[in-house]
């Protein structure tokens, strides 16, 4: 279940708490992995908010054949019902319902929950309440002490025979009963037997901002984190032919000749496109835009680089830096550097301090020295979710 807004955790540029990073990985990605790694689990329905599809793709770029996305409703109870309905065609024997913000669910607990499931009862992992409980009066003064004997704090995943728990949710929906605080309460209402088993102290729910901070600190202490930072390089060269301007980084620069190419021959953008694609192992510019395809004849090269940037972002990548070195005797790049930098900022959606454009000559050596063309070398640095695997 990952359709909530997580308002108690406060606002974050990363989105609701299920998409915040702990140990360089989104909370939801870590939670989901516990289930995709479990051989006892079949289809997994991930229920998300209707506005969160882009956040989900960034948090969980990997494709899992047994994972389906379900759009949730206005409440957790309604989102759960919709998630259960999404599995109706498969009609599994059992179902586990888990909070997406409990990322420390372990394989041992999952296996014990499943082992205790029967057609006649559900399973609720829970921990005995260790603290003394007090009931307060309206004025905040202690009214009475409550015996903690037989009291447990419920956790998830809560597991049930599929058909009975779906039926219970449908009945609650039919009469607009929305006051259940968890799925075990709905099961209790419909007299579905639920067995309590020992939960796990590690299986905490991340509710407040401090919970997320502590989870991040815990993961970083558990092991050295190697962020998934990737670097790609690109190189391109185009010869001159008769003309009156060259296009570099999307900017037209007056010149005594133009660059020869199938598209607009923007040597800088071509090199940078290859550099971005390299960070995904996604081939080169010719793979995506073959020169044999007439539709790219004379095309603006910003189409190519924006396509490469889209591939990066769909995998959750954030472009940290791009660097372009132009090698030419002419034209002079300096007077146009600011415009070229701004053009790259607009194409890639990054700040100017993350863009470097440099120029050098070839000291009159080789084809560049003979003013026969321009070469470009580009480097892109991209940060992807997660970390480098061991």
UniProtKB/Swiss-Prot annotation:
It comes from Brucella suis biovar 1 (strain 1330). Gene3D superfamilies: 2-C-methyl-D-erythritol 2,4-cyclodiphosphate synthase, Spore Coat Polysaccharide Biosynthesis Protein SpsA, Chain A. In the N-terminal section; belongs to the IspD/TarI cytidylyltransferase family. IspD subfamily. The record marks 8, 17, 262, 361 as: Transition state stabilizer. Pathway: Isoprenoid biosynthesis; isopentenyl diphosphate biosynthesis via DXP pathway; isopentenyl diphosphate from 1-deoxy-D-xylulose 5-phosphate: step 2/6; Isoprenoid biosynthesis; isopentenyl diphosphate biosynthesis via DXP pathway; isopentenyl diphosphate from 1-deoxy-D-xylulose 5-phosphate: step 4/6. This is Bifunctional enzyme IspD/IspF. The gene is ispDF. GO terms for molecular function: 2-C-methyl-D-erythritol 2,4-cyclodiphosphate synthase activity; 2-C-methyl-D-erythritol 4-phosphate cytidylyltransferase activity; metal ion binding. Residues 1-229 are annotated as: 2-C-methyl-D-erythritol 4-phosphate cytidylyltransferase. It comes from the Bacteria. HAMAP family: IspDF (MF_01520), IspF (MF_00107). Bifunctional enzyme that catalyzes the formation of 4-diphosphocytidyl-2-C-methyl-D-erythritol from CTP and 2-C-methyl-D-erythritol 4-phosphate (MEP) (IspD), and catalyzes the conversion of 4-diphosphocytidyl-2-C-methyl-D-erythritol 2-phosphate (CDP-ME2P) to 2-C-methyl-D-erythritol 2,4-cyclodiphosphate (ME-CPP) with a corresponding release of cytidine 5-monophosphate (CMP) (IspF). A divalent metal cation binds at residues 236, 238, 270.
């Amino acid at each position: 279940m990952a359709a909530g807004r997580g308002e108690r955790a406060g606002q974050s540029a990363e989105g609701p708490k299920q998409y915040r990073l702990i140990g360089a990985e989104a909370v939801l990605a870590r939670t989901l992995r516990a289930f995709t790694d479990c051989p006892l689990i079949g289809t997994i329905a991930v229920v998300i908010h209707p506005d969160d599809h882009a956040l989900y793709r960034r948090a969980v770029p990997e494709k899992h054949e047994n994972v389906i996305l379900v759009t949730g409703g206005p409440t957790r109870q309604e989102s759960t019902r919709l998630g259960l309905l999404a599995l109706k065609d498969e009609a599994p024997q059992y179902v586990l319902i888990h909070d997406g913000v409990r990322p420390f669910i372990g394989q041992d607990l999952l296996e014990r929950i499943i082992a205790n499931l029967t057609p006649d009862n559900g399973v609720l992992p829970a921990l005995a309440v260790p603290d003394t409980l007090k009931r307060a009066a309206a004025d905040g003064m202690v009214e009475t002490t409550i015996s903690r004997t037989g009291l447990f704090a419920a956790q998830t995943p809560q597991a049930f025979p599929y058909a009975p728990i779906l039926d219970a949710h449908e009945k609650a929906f039919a009469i607009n009963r929305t006051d259940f605080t968890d799925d075990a309460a709905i099961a209790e209402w419909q007299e579905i037997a639920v067995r309590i088993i020992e939960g796990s102290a590690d299986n905490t729910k991340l509710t407040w901002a401090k919970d997320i901070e502590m989870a991040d600190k815990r993961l970083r202490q558990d092991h050295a984190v190697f962020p998934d930072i990737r670097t790609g390089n690109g190189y391109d060269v185009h010869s001159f032919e008769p003309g009156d301007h060259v296009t570099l980084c999307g900017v037209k620069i007056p010149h005594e000749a133009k660059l020869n190419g199938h598209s607009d021959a923007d040597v800088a953008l071509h090199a940078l496109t290859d550099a971005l694609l390299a960070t995904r192992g996604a081939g080169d510019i010719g793979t995506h835009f073959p020169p044999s395809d007439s539709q790219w004849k004379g095309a603006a090269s910003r189409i190519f680089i924006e396509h490469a940037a889209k591939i990066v972002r769909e995998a959750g990548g954030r472009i940290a830096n791009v660097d372009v070195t132009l090698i030419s005797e002419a034209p002079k790049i300096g007077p146009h550097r600011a415009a070229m930098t701004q053009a790259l900022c607009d194409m890639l959606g990054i700040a100017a301090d993350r863009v470097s454009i440099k120029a050098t000559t070839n000291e009159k050596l080789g084809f560049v020295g003979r003013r026969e063309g321009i070469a470009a070398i580009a480097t892109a640095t991209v940060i992807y979710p997660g970390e480098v695997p061991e």
